[in-house]
Amino acid sequence: LDRDGTIIEDYEDELWRNKTEPIFLVGSIEALEKIKQKGYEIIILTNQYLIDEKIISIEQYQDFTDKFIKRIKDNGIEILDVFYCPHSRESNCSCMKPKEGLVKKSLEKYPEIDLKDCFIVGDSLCDVELGKRLGIKTFGIGVGKKEGEVIIIDSLGDVASYI
């Protein structure tokens, strides 16, 4: 799953400088719970180019992520892991979505995961493109177009009826 704009509020880049607490989108906690109840593990894949572009520090990112995970855990939901790309948009790294580096890292750490049993949910074209590249079920929150394995939804809450 993507994080910003999918599970929590997203902001214009500069506004992230002053954000210290995650604001969860309406219904996102309940949606995570339904995904877990259906037997799925939850892995977060997030582009965090704001780190390399000096808008936020790695410490700010980690503090924010710790609060994000704690809030979810306080609701009885376990997140298996969070993988992030800290590189700038100009870096041409292999881990920034839609490239597959974050997925490869997650599969290296969790070799028992079979990609064909996975799905991707995100609110940006890079999330949809990643899912298409991987050939897995992909949910675009208000983005993309229905083709192949891509399903357009209004929010994370809509995913449970498709999985």
Please provide the spans of the model-predicted regions.
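Active-site neighborhood of HAD-like aspartate-dependent phosphohydrolases
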Residues: 1-43
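Asp-based, Mg2+/Mn2+-dependent phosphohydrolase catalytic module
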Residues: 3, 59, 63-80, 90-120, ...
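Ser/Thr-centric signal marking residues that sit
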Residues: 6, 46, 138
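Conserved protein kinase catalytic core
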Residues: 8-10, 53, 129, 161
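Histidine-centered beta-alpha loop that forms part of the nucleotide-sugar donor binding/catalytic region
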Residues: 10, 47, 143-144
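A short acidic, helix-capping loop that chelates divalent metal ions and anchors anionic groups
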Residues: 15-17, 51-55, 88-93, 147-148
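Substrate-recognition element of Asp-dependent hydrolases with the DxDx(T/V) motif
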Residues: 28, 32-65, 81-88, 131
